[in-house]
């Protein structure tokens, strides 16, 4: 399952007249339920979705929203894992979600149809479709190079951390 993630933090902004002011800011992104243990639901997202957060809220497909805690981050790979306490979730929410099925990106081929699911523009879950345009695209950001999948499925602000699925529903 894909979830919406909201991040509330405080940003310090330089004033035009000198000095600084603090402003509360909110951003949104997406996450993918990748695991569950006895007490927590584990959600993978991008590090930049949760970086600098004072409060992280996860919203599920049934519109239930709960606070989440950061379990770990890897800024160089732009990855993060957040956790939601299972005791905060109703039986209805638990029955509406499931852990994502993981595929193997080495099995993808150019031209294969894919679906992108995320929290586009912070409006809640959206789905776009497209094709794998290229594999192993080398992209360098902040002196870190990654090998990525290129797709023509629309990816909008808020989709960060969301899922790119093959037609078998595998991540």
Regions found by a protein language model. Name each.
Residues 1-171:
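Serine-dependent protease modules
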């Amino acid at each position: 399952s894909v979830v919406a993630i909201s991040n509330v933090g405080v940003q310090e902004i330089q004033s035009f007249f000198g000095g600084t002011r603090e402003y509360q800011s909110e951003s949104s992104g997406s996450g993918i339920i990748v695991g569950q243990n006895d007490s927590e639901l584990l959600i993978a997202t991008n590090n930049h979705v949760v970086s600098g957060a004072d409060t992280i809220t996860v919203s599920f497909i049934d519109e239930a929203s709960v606070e989440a805690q950061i379990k770990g981050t890897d800024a160089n790979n732009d990855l993060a894992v957040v956790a939601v306490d299972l005791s905060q979730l109703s039986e209805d929410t638990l029955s509406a979600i499931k852990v994502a099925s993981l595929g193997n990106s080495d099995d993808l081929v150019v031209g294969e149809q894919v679906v992108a699911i995320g929290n586009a523009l912070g409006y809640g879950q959206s789905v776009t479709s497209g094709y794998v345009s290229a594999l192993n695209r080398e992209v360098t950001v902040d002196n870190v190079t990654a090998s990525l999948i290129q797709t023509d499925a629309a990816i909008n602000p808020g989709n960060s951390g969301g899922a790119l699925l093959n037609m078998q529903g595998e991540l």
